[in-house]
Amino acid sequence: MTLRNIPLIGMLSAVLLTVQVGLAFLPNVELISLLIIIYTLILNKKTIYIIITFVLLQGLLYGFGLWWVNYLYVWFVLAIITRIFKKETSPISWALISGFYGLSFGALCSIPYFFIGLSNGTLESGFNTAFAYWINGIPFDLVHGISNFFIALVLFKPIYKLLDYLYKKFNIVQ
């Protein structure tokens, strides 16, 4: 990481926060997933710093509640998935990955509830608590998955091309 990367990380984190706040009035419709996919494809490991900054900004803006614990890992899961499929070039592939990620978001976010349920003393209680949380959010996960799919299908290529162009134009060092 170079000194030159710090403003880049700050700006791209601010973009994540801005689009999140800007679309907050639409439940589970977001550009964060698509942007993290594109950031990971182009910026590789720098995305880690962008995610950390974004998550800290979210906590400062909205408070450090239980929802925030989810953010400590869910966006990193998406970055890891992106790294696994980094050879994919088709917008439809990324739309499917983004859509599936949106569908699974509630399941990923149910993990802390498993541990809360464990505090009642049994493994079954942990699973029941996490399962109840996940089932309760399925309508939101459906919206999240469908909107992620269409957002990525339409915007993946233009945003990827723009960020890749800027990355090369300003000779941002790996």
Regions found by a protein language model. Give the residues of each.
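Hydrophobic transmembrane alpha-helices
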Residues: 1-42, 46-53
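Structural signal for the C-terminal ends of transmembrane alpha-helices
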Residues: 41-44, 81-89, 157-164
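Interfacial aromatic-anchored transmembrane helix boundaries in multi-pass membrane proteins
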Residues: 17-30, 53-88
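Alpha-helical transmembrane segments and their membrane-interface exit regions
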Residues: 36-43, 76-84, 102-103
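Membrane-interface helix-boundary motifs at transmembrane edges
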Residues: 1-3, 84-95
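Membrane-embedded alpha-helical hairpins and interfacial helices in multi-pass inner-membrane proteins
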Residues: 68-69, 90-174
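Central hydrophobic cores of alpha-helical transmembrane segments
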Residues: 48-59, 93-103
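Pore-lining transmembrane helices
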Residues: 33, 47-51, 55, 140, ...
